[in-house]
């Protein structure tokens, strides 16, 4: 498999695990025609990396990804970091702030990275960034999350719609 420019570079990290996708989530839902269909990978250094390809329907200004899309992908990527080693715990967003540094194009694969910076019993703080195809930081984010089980979040959870979908072209490094 040939790696895209977003996946190449000295900062490549070994993938330890692929995280599940849902059916209908806007960010990771594989059956959501308008969604990002992002794939999430846990790395050897305790980060979560999302690979996703935004499309014209995700634009704001012509040729540019809408800032809300950046917020969505970073929120989910950072929030998933708590599931490393704790797949039954979910991060529910309390506070999220972003800094936009460069525009993001659509139609190419992009990479978001998230990590926990402070981990308490009921809360955690995280930070993350999205990279341009040439490896520059385009968006940075910081957030705070409450730790919850899925039963505390919703009574409409369907475990059959939340599973890992392995593909032959899944990367071994991101």
Regions found by a protein language model. Give the residues of each.
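A generic structural signal for short beta-strands and their flanking turns/coil linkers
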Residues: 21-22, 34-36, 46-48, 90-96, ...
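Catalytic strand-loop segment that frames the active site of acyl-thioester-processing enzymes
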Residues: 23, 27-65
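N-proximal, solvent-exposed amphipathic alpha-helical segments enriched in charged/polar residues
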Residues: 14-26
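Hydrophobic beta-strand-centered segment that forms part of the acyl-chain substrate-binding groove
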Residues: 3, 77-111
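Conserved N-terminal beta-strand and adjoining loop/helix that marks the start
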Residues: 68-72
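Short beta-strand micro-motifs enriched in acidic
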Residues: 41-43, 115-119
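HotDog/MaoC-like acyl-thioester-processing domains
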Residues: 3-17, 105-106, 117-174
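A structural signal for short, well-ordered beta-strand segments
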Residues: 50, 96-100, 114, 128, ...
């Amino acid at each position: 498999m040939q790696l895209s420019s977003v996946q190449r570079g000295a900062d490549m990290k070994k993938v330890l695990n692929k995280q599940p996708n849902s059916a209908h989530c806007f960010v990771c839902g594989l059956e959501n025609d308008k969604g990002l269909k992002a794939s999430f990978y846990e790395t050897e250094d305790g980060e979560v990396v999302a690979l996703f390809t935004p499309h014209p329907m995700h634009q704001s200004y012509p040729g540019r990804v809408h800032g809300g899309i950046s917020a969505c992908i970073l929120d989910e990527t950072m929030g998933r970091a708590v599931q490393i080693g704790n797949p039954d715990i979910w991060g529910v967003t309390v506070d999220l702030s972003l800094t936009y540094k460069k525009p993001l194009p659509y139609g190419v694969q992009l990479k978001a990275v998230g990590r926990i910076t402070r981990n308490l019993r009921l809360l955690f703080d995280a930070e993350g960034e999205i990279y341009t195809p040439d490896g520059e930081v385009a968006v940075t984010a910081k957030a705070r999350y409450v730790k919850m089980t899925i039963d505390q979040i919703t009574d409409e959870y369907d475990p059959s719609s939340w599973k890992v979908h392995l593909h032959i072209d899944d990367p071994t490094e991101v």
